[in-house]
Every structure is written in structure tokens, then in C-alpha cells.
Amino acid sequence: MSVDISNFPNLALADTPVELRSLPFERLPLLCNELREYLLRSVSRSSGHLASGLGTVELTVALHYVYNTPFDRLVWDVGHQAYPHKILTGRRDRMQSIRQKDGLHPFPWRGESEYDVLSVGHSSTSIGAALGMAVAAESEGLGRKVVAVIGDGAITAGMAFEALNHAGDVHKDMLVVLNDNEMSISENVGALNNHLARIMSGKLYTTIREGGKKVLAGLPPVKELAKRAEEHLKGMVVPGTLFEELGFNYIGPIDGHDIEALVETLRNMRNLKDPQLLHVKTKKGKGYEPAEKDPIGYHGVPKFDPDECTLPKASGGKPSFSAIFGQWLCDMAAKDEKLVGITPAMREGSGLVKFSQQYPDRYFDVAIAEQHAVTFAAGLAIADKKPVVAIYSSFLQRAYDQVIHDVALQSLPVLFAIDRAGLVGADGPTHQGAFDISFLRTVPNMVVMTPSDENECRQMLYTGYQCNQPAAVRYPRGSGTGIEVQTEMQVLELGKGRIVRNGKGTAILAFGTLLQQARAAAEALDATLVDMRFVKPMDEALVLSLAASHDQFVTIEDNAIMGGAGSAVNELLMRNKQCKPVLNLGLPDRFVEQGTQEEIYALLGLDSTGIQASIEAWLQA
């Protein structure tokens, strides 16, 4: 059920940016209040990302009010903060469907709206893409403006600084808005800074500034002295020296919840030449006290009653795989003081909270820097430490060269705990863990393990930690079967699977937690069922022995079929001249859409019913 728009009279008049720009300026504060309340009421009914969007209401309104979107291009980074943008760009009445199957995409998505100029989901891409658009805009000569909005977390990533460096070098007209909601850069926010921002973005100041640069450019000693004096004086007021050094005109910080200051400053900056950076201070969760107090807890929320000012407590059911990993990490750290835990800004999601509290000196959150996380781990391993990198499958894609060049090439003992492998559900195609088996199994020296349940996950983490070479354990989002997890840890024999059920005719080789869904098919078909455990090294002897006693194979995995574990089985059989029919079940050759995990597994035929139906249809063909 959607939110009744009749309770929001000003928002009702701004279904699109064109309608928004027709509103008198004086009504914008009321509009912002209604937009924030509508967002809260909508997300609380649908679930989704809340705190970030609450903090960008005024900024979103100001950007669409000043810029002629969609002709002017507005590029959002990651997209957690873009819910107000979706509401104002013709999607207000569909917000209750966000992150649901066949509903609105959780992030800006090009196929969904002409206002979404860049499909996003991973961080730190906005500036690079916006620069490309700015270069194209200059060549077309139509006066098109380009704006990138990036958070203070995302801007710490290497590729964001690569783009800033390039933008400052090519001097194209573009605006980068730094949405600073963590007080990690500066706390100098208030009336004085808002006033300074208006002055510094105004025509008079800009003319004097640029004119002065041209005059001083002909006087090298004076130019250098003036530059140093400007840096010294400016550093006393604003923290923009770094951005100025990169070639940007820095303005701010200003209050990101002062709609009047935002609109006036953006109007001034819209006409400025060369790269501009506006530093905006916002409060994550703004306007909803529980979210302001706990922005991490309210970052992504389930359905809840906002009037109760509390989120529903998670049921005390089966532990998640992330929790299994977190407990293993603490247990292992107690046994081995060489253990070091590393995460690229995913402490809560990866289950590292307890470890970070118990072992703060051995815990490193390297921020959104996946490439650095892996090479940092390599350095630790060289220095006789035992690094464990906790990372989401989709984010490990960013560090593939570092996995190969910095870890595997030197066969360093780095353990990769790969969370969110397989289908993650509501976050959609940008976050599905569809490719890690494919890109890791091709890497020499790498051990790749796929636990079928929580206990295997714990034992495989221990096995990878002890194997003295690069190793990866991949496990899905959510909980497992509820099987008892053994406290005692044991090293599994590398490359050895186990037969779960003996049958005849068909051998089903399961990689990972889809073993549970394959059980019903194995029973119905009287097939042999194998928990393969290892993608690399694979249990070749077991597969070949099954080839001698079975007529056909079925492989099952929650990874892309192309290049996945099933492909490894195919290669093994062909290499040994075992020409057996093989049905490979897994993720198709497309970017898999959003929905609940259960919905998408069923859609792809990877639930119990679908697996059995696929095998039966294949056998009868």
C-alpha cells in the first residue's frame, strides 16, 4: 500500500523536476519537510536504504531546482542516497516496490528513468563518469552541465582520486558535490561558512580570483608567494587545499540542510568554468531522531513502524554465515596472535564487529579500497602475519589484479573470506556474487572452497588459514541449515569431496549451499549426491571414479555457469576422455535481477523444485 500523497500538498505538486522548478522558492522548505516525511513513511513500508536519503533531501531538491535535469546530467555515486531523487523524478507512486521483484531498482538505473544517467551500486564511480560526460558536453556545445554527487566515504577510494586528478588536469566544466555526513573532513559548518561559500561562488569573487591568477602568472616569484599566502589563509577557513592542488575551485563547507544557501550557492556555481567542488555537510538520518542517533542501524532497514521509533529485533534463529565467520575469526585470533583481520568498509556486514572490539590492534578497516586491502594483506603476509580479508564477492571483483599479482603470484598465505557469494537478493545485479568461482579458479596457487553448511564453513576457514597459500572460502548471504557447528577446528584434506548419498545412473555434484536444494532431486531420481567442497583443487579421483560407474553428471552451483565449477568438471572429463553427458546448473549468462533470494532462486530454477524439474526434463530429452 502506497503512502497517501494527499497528506503532502507541496510534494504532490512536484512529481517531476519540471514541476519542482515551477514552484516558488519560498515553498522549498515546506517541500523538503514533506519529502523527508514521505521518504520515511515509504521506506518503512517497503524496506530499503533510509538514513542516507534522509540526509540528502535538501541537496536533492536544490540540485533539481537549479539544474535543468535531465538535459543537465546529475550523477549519483553508489545510490543509497538517491531515494529522494527517485521520488522527485516521476517514481513517487512506485516507491513501495523498491528493491522488490519487478519493482524499482535499489539504485539509480539507466533503464528505469531518463534522470538516471549512470547505473550504479558500487562506490566511487561518479566523478570518472561525470568527467567523461563533461568532455562530451564541451564537444557538443549545447551548454549542458554535469554534476557528480559523492559521499565522504566513497571519495576515499582510489578511483575517485584518479578521476579528480584527471579532471583537474583537463579543466572541463563540471561540479563535484561532496556530501560529507560523517564529520571526517571538517566541522567548520555554520552561518559564517555559508556566507563565505556564497561570496566565494559569486561573480565578483570569481572574476577577481581568476583575473588575479592571470596577472600573477607572469610574475613567477610573486605568483608562488601569492599562492602560498592564499593556501595559508584559506587553510584557516576551509579544508579545501587538497582539492585546489588537484585543480578544483573549492567552495564550502556549507550546511546541506539550508535550502536557501544551497540554491544560491549552486546558482552561482552553475555558471563557473573549470572543475568546481562544493563541500556540503549533511546529517545522515536527518529529521528522524532514531536514524540520527544510529545512522548505521538505519542505513538499510526492514519494514517497521516509524511511530514506534525502533526497528524490529531479528529473530534469534539460525546464525548467519557472516556470524559464523565472525565467531571463527575471534576464536582463531585467540589461538594465533599473528592473525590480522581486514575489511574494506564492511565491518557490520561482514561480521567483524566483535573482532574489532576484542582485537582493535589487529583489526583494519581500510575504507572503500578493495585493491589496497588485498595488497596490504600481501605485505602483512610477507612480514610473517596471517591476514584474513573479509570482503563481499561483488567487491572482490575490484581487486582481481591484486589477487593475482600481489598475492597468488608470490603464493602468499592470505585467506579471503568471501561473503555474499551467489544471489544476494534485493540489492540486485550490482551486488550478486555471480563471478567469484569463475575468476578465482583460473588463478594459479589459489585454493577455492565452497562450504555446504555452517560447520563446513568454519572448518574450511580453518583449513584455508592453515594451508600456507592463497585460499578463498565463499559463502552466501543469510543463514544456513541450522546444523550444529563444532567448536573444535580441523583441517580438511585439500581437494577431497564427500559422497552424501549413493545412487545410480546420475551423479549430482553440488558446490556450496545448493547441496541442500539438490537433496530432494537426488532422492526422487535415486541419484548419487556429492558435496564437492573444493572447486580448486578439485577431487579429480572422485569425479573419475563416478564417471566409471554412472551414466551422466549434473553440476550445481550458485555462480555463473560460464567458467564456473561445472566448467571445471567438464574440462576434467574431456581431458580424461570421459565423454559423459553433463548438465550444468547455475546462474545464467545475464545480470540477475532483484527480488528476495527465494524468489530469484525459484525464478532461475535453482530451488528444490526447479532443480528436480530441470534434471528430469534433461534426462527425458
Curated annotation (Swiss-Prot):
Q: Of which family is this protein a member?
A: Belongs to the transketolase family. DXPS subfamily.
- Cofactor requirements of the protein: Mg(2+); thiamine diphosphate
Listed A to Z, the keywords are: Isoprene biosynthesis, Magnesium, Metal-binding, Thiamine biosynthesis, Thiamine pyrophosphate, Transferase
So what does this thing catalyse? D-glyceraldehyde 3-phosphate + pyruvate + H(+) = 1-deoxy-D-xylulose 5-phosphate + CO2
For this protein, the record's Pfam families field holds:
DXP_synthase_N, Transket_pyr, Transketolase_C
PANTHER family xref list: 1-D-DEOXYXYLULOSE 5-PHOSPHATE SYNTHASE-RELATED, 1-DEOXY-D-XYLULOSE-5-PHOSPHATE SYNTHASE, CHLOROPLASTIC
Tell me a GO cellular component.
cytosol
Q: What is its EC number?
A: 2.2.1.7
Q: Which residues bind Mg(2+)?
A: 152, 181
Quaternary structure? Homodimer.
Name the CDD domains for this protein: TPP_DXS (cd02007), TPP_PYR_DXS_TK_like (cd07033)
Q: Which residues bind thiamine diphosphate?
A: 80, 121-123, 153-154, 181, 288, 370
> Can you name this protein?
1-deoxy-D-xylulose-5-phosphate synthase
InterPro entries named in the record: Dxylulose-5-P_synthase, THDP-binding, Transketo_C/PFOR_II, Transketolase-like_Pyr-bd, Transketolase_BS, Transketolase_C
Function (record text): Catalyzes the acyloin condensation reaction between C atoms 2 and 3 of pyruvate and glyceraldehyde 3-phosphate to yield 1-deoxy-D-xylulose-5-phosphate (DXP).
Q: What is the gene called?
A: dxs
